[in-house]
């Protein structure tokens, strides 16, 4: 039964490029290793990233993909004011201090050694007071106290909106914004995170007598957004990490790749193998990052 289900998923619910199922690439990152006060990629600079690419080339260890994760955008490196990668989402412009020419110089170096360039985004979670929240308040879903918060967000610095992908105008705007960003910065693969509990935002904004309609329209918008990117960039891979494994339903993996199947993967190799065993019964393709 498991083999039959896996064949079904492979045939009908796996993103294909050129008619063939996507093969997940061997990837590496530019991570500093998070020395204090850095977190994720908030201490990364253009020079450091390019030096990392050259280092991999020096030892003939060039991967298929170089991966830039969270913390490349405005305000994410402002540790003096308690800012970090997580509480500055919604500021989707490149930090010009650390990356004065944008991300294109890094992309060019990655392409020089024959690799692809993948960059992390989390466009759905929008911090209150961020650029998107201030510029487009009409597209922000507010949970109005109904959202469930995870422990790591209960510090008073992670109060956010949910970008309303269920609004067609908002969805079209975001699709073009992200698409233009990928093109201008030479990005080959798009990595989308989702560190938020959406149910409270949806239920707080349902129309009277139409319970669940906000969620339905939102998910339709999400799929439309991914399809826009995939149609605009043939060969694009959408890595849907979503806090690790939160979007491995059949419709999501039909359009994207769970290349980071769980955030539990930080430094626990026995856990990796347990996940490999369990998920292999159902999903023919998934990754640890």
Q: How would you describe each model-predicted region?
A:
Residues 1-11, 17:
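Extended acidic/polar, glycine-enriched regions
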Residues 23-179, 185, 189:
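Aromatic-lined carbohydrate-binding/catalytic grooves of carbohydrate-active enzymes
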Residues 71, 195, 243-246:
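Flexible loop residues that form catalytic
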Residues 127, 132-172, 176, 216-289:
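Glycan-recognition surfaces
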Residues 68, 192-194, 240:
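Conserved beta-strand positions
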Residues 177-220:
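N-terminal/domain-start segments enriched in small and hydrophobic, helix-friendly residues
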